[in-house]
Each structure stands twice: as C-alpha cells, then as structure tokens.
C-alpha cells in the first residue's frame, strides 16, 4: 500500500497556522506524507512550516477585504492565476485528502480540490467563520468548528491543540498549593498588543504595593523596550519578556491572564483551565475576537473588557477585587469548556475519506 498524502492549507496568521501544524504533525505521526499549501515568502507560514519538516507549496493569492476598489478590480485575474497554480499543486502532490484551516489562501485551492474530486476537510477556528471557510463549507465533505453553531451542519470539536496544553494539572490541583501574591500573566502575542502594554503598567501603578500581583508581561519583540520604559515610569516591578517559550506551562502557572481573544488563545486557556480578562482586538475581521471571548465569559470562565471603554482605573479596580477563591471558581468554569479531541477528529475524518480514494 502506497503512503497516504495529505495537503494541509492554512496561512495568514498564527490563528490558522498553529492549529494547522497540530493537525499536520498528528497526520505525520500516523504515517501520512504531509504537504503544506500557503502563501510564498515572506509569509508567516513560509517562515514556520518548512522548519518543522513539511514540504511547502505556495500559491500567489491575497485577501481583498478592506483593500479598496482597485484590488477588487484585479480579483478575477488573481483568482484565475490562483486556480491554475492550485491545480498544478494538486496534480503534482496527488493528495488523498485536502485539509483547510482557513485563511484566504485556502479558497482557490479548496475549490480546485473539489473540482478534481479530492475529499475536502475543513476546520474553522473562530466563532465567526472566515470568508474562505464560509464558501468552502458548502462543498466540503466534513466540516469542524472550534465553537458551537458557527457553520450549518458542522461538528463542534474545539481547536486542534499541541499536546502540552492537554497535560497540565487540573485547576484544583494547581491552585491548592498557592499562597502569597496573585500571579498575573499578560500576553500580547507574537506582534504585541500596544494597548495592553500601555494600560496594564498604568493600572498596576494605581494599586498599593501590597495589592499588586507578581507580573509576567510578554510584549512582542518590537515592543519590549517601550514596555520596559512603561513599567519603569509606573514604578512597578515585573518580569518582561518578548516571547514565551512554553505557553502551556506559563498559563498553568498563572492565577489570571490578561490577553486578546484570538481563537487559539481562548482554546488554550480553556484547555488548561485559566481565567482571563479578555480585551479583544477591536479591528479584528467581523469582530470575531469579541465573539470568541463571549463564549467563555458567558460560561463564567473570565471577564470581557472592551478596549474602547477600558481604563487604567477600571482595570485596577477589577484586579483589586480578585482573590484565589474567586479565580479558582472561574478557572474551573473555563476548564469545563475544554474540547480536547479536535485534532483526533480531523485526523479520523482524513483516514475515513482517504479509504475511498486512490490518488
């Protein structure tokens, strides 16, 4: 029996790429040969994926939302080129299954996969489906979502996660031995979150020294110097870092996280069982980060504080009112939302669909 081949399509942001990598690594562990379809350099996927040992294919196609009428005018020609490039990739790779995890790059290749009778599996990470997945869901063989009631007929399985997030102790086990100041983790993401980098030091400065938590603040590489200056000006001690190497462990060690509300972050926090103050990125497409956060907040797993109305005074007052008993209760409610079988569900769908194909 020849080795099975899968083509994984994902690109644009880490919210698509990292779940795609979780699926790709699981497929490879089961003996699949995995190729990745993304945008050419200097894309994020081109930087991350080949370094993990996956064959990389590229199609030149970019998003059009919010780009103006000139970009829309060229869309038909760009689509035709992307269709032709996608067909060439599909004929060269000859996958038994094509797996799409969102991002504009998956649209032309997904449509051509269906045209060439390739089984198509989709996974949507956000609580509001992106344009590519909204289109492809109508013709895909299997559709999975990270949140409930996102796409009609889809199966709610959560987001694909790296194993480390599933191996942490329960909230009750973690909180049991803790004492002293609360442990606060502020996560700005790979690019940083300037609003958090500015607001959090100001809020902490409004707390008396004995009220302040132990702070670890991740800023993003480009903002670390400005963050150091902000904490120095506020007179607040904190551990500042541009990146977090082991996010799962960092989440598990925190009593509380302040963060944006990207789909992967929300899923990882519920998988570990950590309460969070969510400050959604206000310019996200379709305001999907607010919808992501509400899913957890309405279940009691955290708090939603929109950026447009958030002040240092309001954040300081919120922090002042928290204790470990309250945080443990919210952590357990977040834990109750965890979905840990998403990767296995996607891989199982690939196995089933591949059994009915020969090339």
Tell what function each PLM region has:
Residues 116, 252-254, 270-279, 299:
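Conserved donor-binding/catalytic loop of nucleotide-activated donor transferases
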Residues 3-10, 28-81, 221-223, 306-308:
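Conserved nucleotide-sugar phosphate-binding/catalytic loop shared by glycosyltransferases and other
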Residues 33, 41, 55, 114-171:
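Active-site-proximal region of nucleotide-activated glycan assembly enzymes
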Residues 95-97, 252-267, 274-275:
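Acidic donor-binding loop of glycosyltransferase active sites
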Residues 37, 42-48, 170-257, 290-294, ...:
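Donor-nucleotide binding loops and adjacent catalytic segments primarily
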Residues 340-359:
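C-terminal alpha-helical cap of glycosyltransferases
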């Amino acid at each position: 029996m020849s080795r099975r081949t899968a083509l994984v399509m994902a690109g644009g942001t880490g919210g698509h790429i990292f779940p795609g990598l979780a699926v790709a690594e699981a497929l490879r562990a089961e003996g699949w040969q995995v190729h990745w379809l993304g945008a050419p350099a200097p894309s994020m996927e081109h930087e991350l994926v080949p370094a993990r040992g996956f064959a990389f294919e590229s199609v030149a196609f970019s998003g059009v939302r919010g780009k103006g009428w000139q970009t829309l005018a060229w869309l038909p020609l760009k689509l035709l080129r992307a269709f032709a490039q996608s067909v060439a990739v599909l004929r060269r790779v000859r996958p038994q299954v094509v797996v799409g995890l969102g991002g504009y790059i998956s649209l032309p290749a997904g449509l051509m996969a269906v045209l060439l009778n390739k089984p198509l599996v989709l996974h949507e990470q956000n609580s509001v489906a992106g344009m590519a997945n909204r289109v492809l869901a109508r013709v895909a063989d299997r559709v999975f979502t990270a949140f409930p009631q996102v796409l009609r007929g889809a199966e709610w399985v959560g987001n694909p996660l790296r194993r480390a997030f599933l191996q942490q102790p329960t909230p009750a086990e973690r909180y049991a031995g803790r004492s002293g100041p609360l442990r606060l983790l502020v996560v700005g993401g790979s690019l940083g979150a300037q609003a958090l980098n500015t607001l959090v030091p100001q809020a902490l400065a409004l707390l008396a020294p004995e009220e302040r938590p132990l702070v670890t603040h991740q800023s993003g590489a480009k903002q670390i110097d400005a963050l150091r200056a902000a904490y120095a000006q506020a007179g607040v001690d904190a551990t500042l870092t541009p990146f977090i190497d082991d996010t799962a462990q960092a989440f598990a060690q925190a009593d509380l996280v302040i963060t944006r509300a990207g789909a992967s972050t929300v899923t990882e926090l519920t998988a570990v069982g950590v309460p969070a103050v969510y400050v959604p990125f206000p310019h996200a497409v379709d305001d999907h980060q607010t919808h992501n956060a509400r899913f957890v907040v309405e279940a009691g797993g955290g708090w939603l504080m929109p950026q447009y109305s958030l002040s240092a005074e309001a954040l300081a007052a919120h922090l002042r009112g928290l204790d470990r008993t309250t945080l443990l209760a919210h952590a357990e409610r977040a834990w109750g939302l965890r979905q840990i079988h998403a990767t296995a569900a996607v891989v199982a769908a690939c196995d089933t669909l591949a059994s009915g194909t020969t090339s």
